[in-house]
């Protein structure tokens, strides 16, 4: 049995790409950090997989690590990180306004807020620092100051969102759990929530209850 809930705050979980952020931040970072020549040269090497992905016969969770390796393997970590920090600041202008306002409401009443995303720690770490919120995401591997092109964690989508969330947060310690997503990769995360919102399906954001059970 689960322990009775004793905490006095809520937990708010936000997917990033397509939910809190209007754009595909993963692809956007590739075009921000790398030259068009490099992107074309490396993209040609994985063109069959890119085509299969756009035909919806190669899944996103498999495409992301393949694309990351093709584009970033061997890059100097410090150079990419400097660009990632710049990119993170720019993402503040790309937020989905209603979802961002919902995040601020959670923040104003002291809820714990977590971005849980398959996108990269390279820029999401800085982004979350700017908003003073927590992060669970796909983490990149660096060895001897170089990006290896591999992830140091599994792609943080679908079941991995649920696994990593439960590993870090005792959900029964919160008054209520809220979750916001936009795709089938968020379903396992949404299944953990008392109040859930799917972009493109649900018409209204859930009302946020105060820790005393009243509307915030």
Spans of model-derived segments:
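C-terminal cap/substrate-recognition subdomain and adjoining C-terminal extension
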Residues: 2-3, 9, 89-216
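Active-site neighborhood of HAD-like aspartate-dependent phosphohydrolases
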Residues: 2-56
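A general structural signal for well-ordered alpha-helical segments in protein cores
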Residues: 26-27, 64, 162
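Residues within well-ordered alpha-helical secondary structure of globular protein domains
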Residues: 32-35, 86, 195
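Juxtamembrane/interface motifs at transmembrane-helix termini
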Residues: 41-43, 49, 61, 99-103, ...
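Short, compositionally biased "basic patch" segments
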Residues: 51-56, 61-77, 135-139
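Metal-dependent phosphoesterase signature
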Residues: 63-98
């Amino acid at each position: 049995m689960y322990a009775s809930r004793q905490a006095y705050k809520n937990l708010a979980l936000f997917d990033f790409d397509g939910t809190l952020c209007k754009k595909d931040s993963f692809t956007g970072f590739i075009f921000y950090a790398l030259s068009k020549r490099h992107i074309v040269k490396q993209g040609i090497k994985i063109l069959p997989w890119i085509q299969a992905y756009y035909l919806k016969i190669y899944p996103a969770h498999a495409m992301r690590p393949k694309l990351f390796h093709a584009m970033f393997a061997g890059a100097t970590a410090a150079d990419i990180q400097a660009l990632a920090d710049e990119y993170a600041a720019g993402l503040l202008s790309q937020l989905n306004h209603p979802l961002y306002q919902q995040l601020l409401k959670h923040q104003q009443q002291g809820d714990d807020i977590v971005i849980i995303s398959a996108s990269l720690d390279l820029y999401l770490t800085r982004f979350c620092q700017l908003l003073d919120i927590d992060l669970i995401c796909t983490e990149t591997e660096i060895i001897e100051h170089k990006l290896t092109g591999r992830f140091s964690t599994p792609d943080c989508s679908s079941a991995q969102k649920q696994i990593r969330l439960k590993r870090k947060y005792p959900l029964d310690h919160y008054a209520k759990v809220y979750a916001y997503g936009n795709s089938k990769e968020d379903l396992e995360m949404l299944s953990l929530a008392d109040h859930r919102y799917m972009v493109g399906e649900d018409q209204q954001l859930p009302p946020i209850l105060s820790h005393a059970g009243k509307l915030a």
